């Protein structure tokens, strides 16, 4: 008679090193816009480094064939206006899912995708699959037009922008606009010219009059409301709201990196 037991298989040294490298890159690029090879762009999810966040499944043909994947961001082909949801598999390969065309194999690692591949292999469809949320519900995505993508990129021109030439380096100036976006498309708010101190109206005792004080208070309150509206989630961020569902039940593994 003999006894047998099972134990959790440890990762190979190469896969463990790839997992550590991928985790470091994602934590450094969380919430940033990255320029891809060929002029395309990718936006990394802000909470991509948190354990158990933004995971889902792909349903393949056949009985009970599910692939556990981690959502890491969105990639945009600026020339054609195509949009891809980016996922990492268990072996840290990068996949792109496009509504209508299915699942695409983009690169064997996140480093290769950001540094060399980009969206150049986006037409290599792996298999016809269905994207599911963490609660195994079908994922529905509205189709965006090219003008919508250009408007979105123009709005994101003032966010943190990172070049793939220095993935883990310092963030470039926020005024650096993404490749392929004309400067005329970026809307700027005009600042009214200020008057010299000698021409400013003053009341008694050198204090500003009551009307000027009320106007100043209204301006400050208006700027506060505008700042709150800018910080609120946009319609584009709500497109993948179901992808951020975090099911913490015991049925699903919490994270790739543990």
UniProtKB/Swiss-Prot annotation:
Residues 163-176 have a biased composition (Polar residues). Pfam families: DUF1314 (PF07013). Residues 163-258 are annotated as: Disordered. Residues 214-240 have a biased composition (Basic and acidic residues). InterPro entries: DUF1314. This is Gene 3 protein. It comes from Equine herpesvirus 1 (strain Kentucky A) (EHV-1).
